[in-house]
UniProtKB/Swiss-Prot annotation:
CC terms in the record's Gene Ontology section: cytoplasm
Enzyme Commission number(s): 3.1.1.96
The protein's name: D-aminoacyl-tRNA deacylase
Intervals of motif Gly-cisPro motif, important for rejection of L-amino acids: 137-138
Originating species: Ligilactobacillus salivarius (strain UCC118)
Length: 148
């Protein structure tokens, strides 16, 4: 499982010209699953995201978590995080999890985040989405359960 985290001042997702989710200060998460991902990976990365100390404290040091700054999450499903690009010029996505399973895992991941009390907005799994954001920092971090 991979989560590309971006610290944002604001972010939104549109589907068919309609805003489906939007947040102010918080985290934009691009979330992808590979074949054997399940509950263990979901628990691990939800905990890592929620506890990441990447917001500035009074001394301008990255020392505060999302919950400590009352931030929100915009979570976007992103199977292209598992693109294979070594051969040829067109990426292959064969390492991405089957969409039926990945959709359920995406829902479980978002629910696990919500259990902490954090506001979680989402796109729609498999939809064509337009994501807008104001990156804060920028701070961009890749989490990968294969690199625990």
């Amino acid at each position: 499982m991979r989560v590309l985290l971006q610290r944002v001042k604001q972010a939104s997702v549109e589907i068919d010209g309609n805003v489906n989710g939007e947040i102010g200060q918080g985290l934009l998460l691009l979330v992808g699953f590979t074949e054997n991902d399940g509950d263990k990976e979901i628990e691990y990365l939800a905990r890592k995201v929620l506890n990441a100390r990447i917001f500035s404290d009074a001394d301008d040091k990255m020392n505060l978590s999302l919950q400590q700054v009352s931030g929100s999450i915009l979570s976007i499903s992103q199977f292209t995080l598992y693109a294979q690009t070594r051969k040829g010029n067109r990426p292959s996505f064969t390492r991405a999890q089957n969409p039926d399973i990945a959709s359920k895992n995406y829902d479980k991941f978002n629910e696990k985040l919500r259990e902490s009390g954090v506001q979680v907005e989402t796109g729609i799994f498999g939809a064509d989405m337009q994501v807008s954001l104001v990156n804060d920092g920028p701070v961009t971090i890749m989490y990968d359960t294969d690199e625990e």
